């Protein structure tokens, strides 16, 4: 017999009764605030074309590497799940997911998925092998209804703005369609882009030289000369800003920065675009370009995000057979104090510059990141990221960052996801965790409740909107 699906109204709140009561009051005031999603990876084609999602597997399984990496770890092949395999039967892929749903117990993925099942699709029984077809049929049938098209869900979720992430090589045609729909009054949803230049900044990115050729064509600049390469970035950044972008994003293997002279930079650029590049050259070029990008952000006002410290594509077989972003990226230990000093030495004192720094290395929270953000005017701390975007990860972030950096050197929450339907669930988790953390401070007489109420609104909405210039 299927087991009931029940979302407790007190989920994630403190178990202490007094703190739980405070958390309830704080949460009640922020639960319905609009969602500001300033960084993520949803597909702008969804909102441009507003075509129906095809089926349950296509919507909830295929885009979510949090889900399929867990299944893969238990021996379920990506081909069987339909990841990059158009011949896979989506119902059978969904059944594999349902049969293995127990693997997600106590994970954030389980919490997000259960929210989607209950709140979006109205299920009151848990997903299992027994209920697999019930789920698949009800979800797939719902997706054929206009109320479940991308734009309708965007509005239903209370999303005020969402940022997607594109490379400089993207034409942004989908964003142009969305902006035209906004201008005509056809749809009011605000979907903006963000400038992620990794394919033309990382010399070890696959197809780097071909990417530079495309970069030249798109910008009208000679991206194989250092001066033309920088001019191409400025042009593409301006184009992205004209399409709504307020931020850039940089996903580097490390947080290394460098501040080279023009002569040094030109010589290095010649090496990384030539035949004699070393791994050290590639790392130095990435490091130098972070500093260059910070300077451009100071000039054009785009907020700069740095997401360092992931060992990308750790599984060579998986990368060769399925490509990137398939759940095989692994956190690494990351230095920030020494690595960021060249960039911060040049631009860290600029109060008009905003650099939002993320980490996958929790050991750096209190030792490095909080002291850095608690000093440099340009530096802010992004929320608990990726593997730490979880109830316990959020609690660790707040407990280790707040005493040194405070709340106002952080930037609220961002969901950073490809899984569109999980966005409200992720924001709800963050709001609940923050209200619980604040409730503890109130109960310990470290905050007044009215201060906690102001903070709850700031952490849920105001800080993200202000930090990302939205």
Curated annotation (Swiss-Prot):
Coiled coil: none
Listed SUPFAM superfamilies: Metallo-dependent hydrolases
InterPro entries in the cross-refs: Metal_Hydrolase, Uronate_isomerase
Gene Ontology MF terms in the entry: glucuronate isomerase activity
Pathway(s) of this molecule: Carbohydrate metabolism; pentose and glucuronate interconversion
Matches recorded under Pfam families: UxaC
HAMAP family: UxaC
Protein name (database record): Uronate isomerase
Source species of the chain: Sphingopyxis alaskensis (strain DSM 13593 / LMG 18877 / RB2256)
């Amino acid at each position: 017999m299927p087991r009931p699906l029940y979302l407790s109204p007190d989920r994630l709140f403190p178990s202490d009764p007094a703190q739980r009561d405070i958390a309830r009051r704080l949460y009640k005031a922020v639960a319905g605030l609009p969602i500001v999603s300033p960084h993520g990876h949803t597909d702008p084609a969804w909102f441009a074309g507003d075509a129906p999602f095809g089926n349950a597997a296509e919507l909830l399984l295929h885009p979510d590497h949090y889900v399929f990496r867990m299944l893969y770890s238990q021996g379920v092949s990506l081909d069987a799940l339909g990841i990059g395999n158009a011949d896979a039967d989506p119902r059978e892929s969904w059944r594999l997911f349902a049969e293995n749903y127990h693997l997600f117990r106590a994970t954030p993925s389980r919490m997000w998925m259960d929210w989607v099942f209950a709140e979006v699709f109205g299920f009151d029984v848990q997903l299992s092998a027994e209920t697999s077809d019930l789920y698949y049929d009800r979800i797939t049938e719902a997706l054929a209804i206009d109320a479940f098209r991308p734009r309708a869900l965007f509005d239903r979720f209370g999303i005020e703005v969402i940022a997607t992430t594109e490379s400089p090589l993207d034409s942004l045609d989908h964003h142009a369609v969305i902006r035209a729909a906004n201008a005509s009054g056809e749809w009011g949803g605000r979907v903006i882009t963000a400038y992620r230049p990794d394919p033309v900044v990382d010399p070890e990115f696959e197809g780097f030289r071909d990417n530079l050729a495309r970069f030249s064509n798109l910008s009208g600049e000679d991206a194989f000369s250092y001066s033309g390469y920088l001019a191409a970035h400025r042009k593409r950044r301006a184009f992205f800003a004209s399409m709504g972008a307020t931020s850039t994003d940089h996903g580097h293997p490390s947080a290394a920065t460098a501040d080279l002279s023009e002569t040094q930079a030109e010589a290095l650029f010649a090496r990384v675009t030539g035949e004699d590049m070393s791994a050290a050259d590639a790392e130095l070029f990435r490091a130098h370009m972070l500093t260059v990008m910070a300077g451009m952000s100071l000039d054009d006002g785009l907020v700069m995000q740095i997401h360092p410290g992931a060992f990308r594509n750790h599984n060579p077989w998986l990368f060769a057979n399925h490509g990137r972003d398939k759940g095989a990226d692994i956190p690494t230990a990351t230095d920030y104090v020494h690595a960021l000093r060249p960039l911060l030495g040049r631009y860290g004192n600029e109060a008009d510059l905003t650099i939002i720094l993320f980490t996958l290395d929790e050991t750096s929270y209190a030792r490095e990141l909080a002291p850095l953000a608690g000093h440099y005017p340009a530096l802010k701390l992004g929320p608990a990221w990726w593997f730490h975007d979880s109830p316990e990860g959020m609690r660790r972030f707040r407990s280790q960052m707040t005493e040194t950096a405070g709340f106002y050197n952080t930037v609220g929450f961002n969901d950073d996801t490809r899984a569109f339907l999980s966005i409200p669930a992720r924001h709800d988790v963050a709001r609940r965790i923050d209200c619980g953390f604040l409730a503890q401070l109130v109960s310990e007489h470290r905050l007044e409740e009215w201060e906690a109420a102001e903070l709850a609104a700031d952490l849920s909405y105001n800080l993200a909107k202000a930090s990302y210039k939205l």
